[in-house]
Amino acid sequence: MKKTKRILAVVLALTLAVGTMIAFSGCSKDGDGDSTKGKTIAVVAKGESHAFWQSVKKGAEDAAAKYGYTITFRGPASESAKDLPSQMEMVQTALSNNVSGLVLATIGEGFVDMLTQAKDKNIPVVQFDSGIWANDVETLNKNSKNPIVASVATSNRMAAGVAAEKFFEDIKADIAAGDGNYVVGVIQHDETQTGIDRAGGFVDKFKELADADETTKGKYTIAQEVKPGDADNAYKAALEALFEKGAKAIFMSNEGVVKQVYDAIGAAGSKYDGIKFCGFDAGSKQIEWMRATTGPKLVGAVAQDSYQIGYNAVEQCVNAIESKTVEAEVAIAGAWWDATNVDEMIKSNLVYEG
């Protein structure tokens, strides 16, 4: 009996010893790098709840899943300065957790120290959407501490080019059948680079298409109204100026223009019924106008393809982590939407209300 007890005691001791070794082995694995270490990418956006950012998140998640990574996705409550400390905390938390990569769009300046940490820790950073503020990037470059490996954003020129292609398809027959003086109007929302690129991208692509077609070549002119912003009903004034110039088609370079123009035509009876319009971005008024069956026609608009922005940003981050070829600049063209696909685009978060 005593011999049996001694044998059982030895067996128990050995079992405990093996269990302890396994336990410590497991702890060592967790400490040195569990199976998820090296597989997490932090995405810190300029927001989280808005439909645009939810679409970015879906794209980011799909890219991460494809390559065997997980992501964390966080964003401040708003893009105002009061929420900048909150976003800074999100970035610092990600760096403290030693994520494999960081995908970032900041709402303000002040990220130099944190991005320097990323550089020192060999954490690649991909900026997306509006990216990281220029002053921060300039300081990082000056200090040779820039961790940014790629930029992913909508190309305003390419997106406006998509709008020009679709708009030209719709009004081509009108130009061809006209008296040779078909006026295409452009309302440029401001004089920033964004405004310049959108208006310029539209005009250049439209001219390319119209001049290459024998039925429209030489039968149109482009009239452009450039405004310093949306104050004092500037875009309504631009609409009236183009109307006086005989515009039969008008491209509007952002949602703010669309809103003011939509309000103006709603208050003007049938005055603008003979004009066709083309928009940019999205929003409730643009959706309402797109669905309208009476009054001036909104042919369509081009929206930022937020899903592709999220997908490509994470994909480039994975490439950097795995020492594969990284595209330093990824330009997203934008997605066309009109009355035929508006519901589908809303469902997929490519077109947002609000």
Feature roles, as predicted:
Residues 1-40, 65-66, 70, 95-96, ...:
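Short, low-complexity disordered leader/linker segments with a strong preference
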Residues 87, 149-182, 232-235, 258, ...:
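Hydrophobic alpha-helical segments within soluble ligand-binding/sensing domains
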Residues 180-189, 194-195, 206, 305-354:
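Hinge/cleft segment of the Venus flytrap/periplasmic-binding protein
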Residues 114-158, 283-295:
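Flexible loop/hinge segments that line or gate small-molecule binding clefts
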Residues 52-67, 159-163, 194-215, 260, ...:
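Short, solvent-exposed amphipathic alpha-helices that sit
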Residues 40-67, 72-88, 99, 105-109, ...:
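Extracytoplasmic "Venus flytrap"
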Residues 92, 104-121, 125, 202, ...:
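Hydrophobic alpha-helical
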Residues 65-82, 183, 206-232:
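Short beta-strand elements in bilobed, periplasmic/extracellular small-molecule ligand-binding domains
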